[in-house]
Amino acid sequence: MNRTKLVLGAVILGSTLLAGCSSNAKIDQLSSDVQTLNAKVDQLSNDVNAMRSDVQAAKDDAARANQRLDNQATKYRK
């Protein structure tokens, strides 16, 4: 039991020391990278949303053009 506690304590101490070895500069750099990536994701999301409205407008125009063609085709058949 004492040996288990000793090993467990050593593992906890070792992990604490390893966590303390990371520098603040590296953490700040990673945080900055994450913020940059989040900004890019937001921009891409906005671009996709803008394209959705453009695609919908193109679909609507195509549907109107097809309807006009269908109307012309029925006039020629009569």
From Swiss-Prot:
Gene3D superfamilies xref list: 1.20.5.190
GO biological process: lipid modification; periplasmic space organization
Pfam families noted in UniProt: LPP
Disruption phenotype: The integrity of the cell envelope in a lpp null mutant (double-knockout) is not affected.
Keywords, sorted A to Z: Cell outer membrane, Cell wall, Coiled coil, Lipoprotein, Membrane, Palmitate, Peptidoglycan-anchor, Repeat, Secreted, Signal, Virulence
InterPro entries per the UniProt record, alphabetical: Lipoprotein_leucine-zipper_dom, MOM_Lpp
Triggers of expression: This gene is probably the major expressed form.
Sequence repeat copies, ranges: 24-34, 38-48
Lipidation, N-palmitoyl cysteine type: C21
Segments for region (Disordered): 56-78
Polar residues bias spans: 68-78
Keyword Transit peptide: no
A GO MF term: peptidoglycan binding
Lipidation feature positions (S-diacylglycerol cysteine): C21
Superkingdom of origin: Bacteria
Compartmental location: Cell outer membrane; Secreted, Cell wall
Signal sequence range: 1-20
Modified residue annotations for N6-murein peptidoglycan lysine: K78
GO cellular component: cell outer membrane; extracellular region
Keyword Secreted: yes
Family: Belongs to the Lpp family.
Protein function: Plays an important role in virulence. A highly abundant outer membrane lipoprotein that controls the distance between the inner and outer membranes. The only protein known to be covalently linked to the peptidoglycan network (PGN). Also non-covalently binds the PGN. The link between the cell outer membrane and PGN contributes to maintenance of the structural and functional integrity of the cell envelope, and maintains the correct distance between the PGN and the outer membrane.
Complexes and interactors: Homotrimer.
Name of the protein in question: Major outer membrane lipoprotein Lpp 1
Native species: Salmonella typhimurium (strain LT2 / SGSC1412 / ATCC 700720)
Gene (UniProt): lpp1
